[in-house]
From Swiss-Prot:
Residues 1-336 are annotated as: A. It comes from the Bacteria. Belongs to the heat shock protein 90 family. The keyword Nucleotide-binding applies. The keyword Transport does not apply. PROSITE patterns: HSP90 (PS00298). One of its GO terms (molecular function) is ATP hydrolysis activity. Its main location: cytoplasm. Keywords: ATP-binding, Chaperone, Cytoplasm, Nucleotide-binding, Stress response. This is Chaperone protein HtpG. It is found in: Cytoplasm.
Amino acid sequence: MSMKGQETRGFQSEVKQLLHLMIHSLYSNKEIFLRELISNASDAADKLRFRALSHPELFEGDGELRVRLSFDKEKRTLTLSDNGIGMSREEVIDNLGTIAKSGTKAFLESIGSDQAKDSQLIGQFGVGFYSAFIVADKVTVRTRAAGAPADAGVFWESAGEGDYTIADITKEDRGTEITLHLREGEDEYLDNWRLRSVISKYSDHIALPVEIESKNEEDGTVTWEKINKAQALWTRGKAEITDDEYKAFYKHIAHDFTDPLIWSHNRVEGKQEYTSLLYIPAQAPWDMWNRDHKHGLKLYVQRVFIMDDAEQFMPNYLRFVRGLIDSNDLPLNVSREILQDSRVTQNLRSALTKRVLQMLEKLAKDDAEKYQQFWQQFGMALKEGPAEDGSNKDTIAKLLRFASTHTDSSAQTVSLEDYVSRMAEGQEKIYYITADSYAAAKNSPHLELFRKKGIEVLLLSDRIDEWMMSYLTEFDGKAFQSVSKADDSLNKLADEERPEQQEADKALEPFVERVKTLLGERVKDVRLTHRLTDTPAIVTTDADEMSTQMAKLFAAAGQQAPEVKYIFELNPEHSLVKRAADVADDTQFAEWVELLLDQALLAERGTLEDPNQFIRRMNQLLTA
């Protein structure tokens, strides 16, 4: 084999690290290399079929796509060859010498020394071609892109360490041939029946025929025997597909090592004709919160693969859903731009979204423990739903889970239906509080009245919660009410209409006016409150005022937020408030009021503009 333009190049540093981790972490599950390489061949065939729709000459007179396996016991090599799209020299460098995934470095840094956990993480990352090095100490690739001349072939070879060799060669047939030079002790992959077993286990469901070489020992003739069903799984009837086949297909399209949590396979006929196969993974992908995270479904049109990651069919808050859609109503030459504006796409998106929400509703109803597993992985994404998808807001609300004062646990297990079923007699609203942490929410002075009255409060401490609640206004006819905002219903709960309270409050009116005069424009108002039992003072906001948590969200995003003007509420029955009311000296009075206000602000915001001044006042009054 004559080679031209030969050069040796170094691997990208992340490739070296990934190869090392794979060989050590995935060895116990080493047979997956065959699944990964056959999966790549299947993708190469799909891409060729799609390109050939507009350029049939790419088939080069050979439209029967397949992948073939052969082995040589003497040379101890295993070879996989496909007649798919193939690669150019630039594509070989890009695909085999680098990892073009954003966040790769951070991902690799997150890998530790726990091998079981590492293998799951690496599998989730999608090892693809590099999995060959689990069983091979040298890998040789010969490839030629479809439509390119024979002398545009490419040779690539590496021992999976620091570098690889690349050169130009002549290759008559298009596609890719990968030869694995097996490590010592890997002779099981030189056995016909062992290879058949692995292929049946992992690749029965893919549409690409997988053929294995059979040699006639008498005359030496070679035949190729198809060993997988080679029928697209989603085109088969549900009754004839086993759970194991569904799970294997999920691992093929998601490049995940773990079984999916649930799935739904549906064929729809009538106004629109399509087949969908949707999966909810058991764990979140490592890069789900990465801005560049690819998501969406595989799109097929009339069983012809069109594209990966077609995000137009699923809203962003369901970006964790994996699977495919095979539509009869879209044109074969569809592009992402056409999809964006297509009425067919919008109708499919609506139907598929409802299907996923129904899957989750059923899971929540039938298996609370499994749903809790889902919530721990994807609850934060689902919380984006009320803002993003108004038409399904009520359904999404039923799927949300919260921590609450009822459970005394940070676990988010309480549904809104649970809450409503436990509402106190005469209670008209669903009460909640948002805070920076579960502990801050649980110990907030705003909850004192509710604990006294035995009324449940939802404890919200995820960063997204305040934003979500600005869209989630009511559930089952009951309005949501933040306990940190002023509201008439809270006054009713506090029995502030009792004559004896009104009389006592009237006696403190001069004190309230004195506090107002002292604080001036720094607060919106000063009031007495009977919502508190153990705390001397709190700050609240009006219903139409931006909340503390929302202001923090704006600040974290680097945006200018209007200053929050608080209402300063004082507990007239608390000894510190009584003591402050009795102070005649204006300077001392100011110290007491400032201390009470700082305490209230600290409880509400978690920070003070001048903590040193607060400490000074505290020390001074403690030693007075």
